[in-house]
């Protein structure tokens, strides 16, 4: 799919990997809609890229009504939707048995709800609008890109909720791709390694240093623009479907 003149929704688009994806898509000629809760940061992005190119909608992706309302606004403002990128998510540090007590159940449920249920929620509602598109010259109506993590493949000590939620996103990928194939909508997932995002920058050295050691070549943290480059390629390469792609320097 050619990104020029297309409409892309990006959850978590106000920072980190999502922001880089918004910027890359706009650079390719797309209109971008940021679904996030950080209005201040989104406003800065809109100021830099232009109000005619980027729109912000404050959205709780874990709830049905706000996402339905957001997608309806996209339809009203742009006439349709071609691409959805799910970048919104977070983690919760804690072992299953901590020093004081077991891992809090409510924290586990929140992470799974945000990272996995939120992704599915946006995917299903976005796909409904994409299905109304006329197929392009390659017969395609839409592309959905989800964000997992190598933690969902390799596991990560002290991140049971995060790892489980991202494993769920990976497990969803091929099923979603096959479900939506009859609607001419592709689904792929990116599983990033260790990236230099605002969240990672807040981590203490005792957390960052071992993670950096686990990278192979190049021996460094990934940059958000490298994630965005892959998000661009997935859209443009029509034969990519149902894949979970590791982006981790061979960790």
Language-model features: where?
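Alpha-helical segment proximal to the catalytic Tyr-Lys
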Residues: 128, 177-179
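C-terminal substrate-recognition "lid" of short-chain dehydrogenase/reductases
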Residues: 223-247
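Catalytic Tyr-X3-Lys loop
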Residues: 90, 101-121, 145, 169
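Catalytic Tyr-x(3-8)-Lys segment
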Residues: 113, 205-226
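Active-site helix of classical SDR
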Residues: 123, 165, 173
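Conserved mid-core segment of classical short-chain dehydrogenase/reductases
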Residues: 91-109, 128, 132-138, 158-161, ...
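Short, small/polar-rich loop/turn modules that mediate ligand/substrate recognition or access, typified
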Residues: 181-186, 240-243
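Residue(s) in the substrate-gating loop at a strand-loop-helix junction
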Residues: 149
């Amino acid at each position: 799919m050619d990104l020029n003149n297309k409409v892309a929704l990006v959850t978590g688009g106000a920072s980190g990997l999502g922001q880089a994806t918004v910027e890359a898509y706009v650079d390719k000629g797309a209109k971008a809609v940021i679904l996030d809760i950080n209005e201040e940061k989104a406003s800065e992005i809109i100021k830099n890229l232009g109000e005619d190119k980027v729109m912000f909608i404050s959205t709780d992706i874990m709830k049905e009504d706000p996402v339905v309302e957001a997608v309806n606004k996209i339809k009203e403002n742009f006439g349709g939707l071609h691409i959805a990128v799910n970048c919104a998510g977070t983690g919760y540090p804690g072992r299953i048995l901590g020093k004081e007590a077991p891992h809090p159940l409510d924290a586990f449920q929140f992470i799974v709800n945000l990272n996995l249920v939120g992704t599915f929620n946006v995917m299903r509602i976005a796909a409904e609008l994409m299905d109304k598109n006329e197929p392009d010259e390659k017969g395609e109506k839409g592309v959905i890109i989800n964000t997992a993590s190598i933690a969902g493949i390799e596991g990560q000590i002290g991140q049971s909720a995060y790892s489980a939620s991202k494993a769920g996103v990976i497990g969803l990928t091929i099923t979603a791709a096959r479900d939506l194939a009859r609607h001419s909508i592709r689904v792929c997932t990116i599983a990033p390694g260790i990236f230099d995002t605002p969240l990672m920058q807040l981590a203490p050295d005792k957390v960052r240093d071992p993670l950096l050691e686990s990278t192979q070549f190049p021996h460094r943290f990934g940059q958000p623009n490298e994630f965005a480059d892959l998000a661009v390629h997935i859209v443009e390469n029509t034969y990519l479907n149902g894949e979970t792609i590791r982006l981790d320097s061979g960790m």
